[in-house]
Curated annotation (Swiss-Prot):
InterPro entries: Ribosomal_uL22 (IPR001063), Ribosomal_uL22_bac/chlpt-type (IPR005727), Ribosomal_uL22_bac/org-type (IPR047867), Ribosomal_uL22_CS (IPR018260), Ribosomal_uL22_sf (IPR036394). This is Large ribosomal subunit protein uL22. It holds the Pfam family Ribosomal_L22. PANTHER family: CHLOROPLAST 50S RIBOSOMAL PROTEIN L22-RELATED, LARGE RIBOSOMAL SUBUNIT PROTEIN UL22M. GO terms for biological process: translation. Coiled coil: none annotated.
């Protein structure tokens, strides 16, 4: 039994979120939550909320035992990129890319 949780449009780049996602892939949910709780990266807090949602989905919808769950699949896709302008000297302007991502976490029995 595999249960998923998704977050679409998270406010960080996919590249930065993947750094955190790669650390918890394949680990038990307890170990993954510990890693995320003590990580200093912004993506860790976002992914932790998605993982907790997936655990709650498994408990509520499937009646799964939390102690036997592991992070079976986690992936991060690029979301929309919002384009902004930053005024510069002499009438010039630079483009600023506000990147977003879609985070998907799947937990399954070991």
């Amino acid at each position: 039994m595999e249960v998923a949780a998704k977050l679409r449009g998270a406010g960080l780049s996919a590249q930065k979120a993947r750094l955190v996602a790669d650390q918890i892939r394949g680990k038990s949910v307890e170990e993954a939550l510990d890693l995320l709780a003590f990580s200093t990266k912004k993506g860790a807090a976002v992914i932790k909320k998605v993982l907790e949602s997936a655990i709650a989905n498994a408990e509520h919808n499937e009646g799964a035992d939390v102690d036997e769950l592991k992070v079976s699949t986690i992936f991060v896709d690029e979301g929309l990129t919002m384009k902004r302008i930053r005024p510069r000297a002499k009438g010039r302007a630079d483009r600023i890319f506000k990147r977003t991502c879609h985070i998907t976490v799947k937990v399954a029995d070991q």
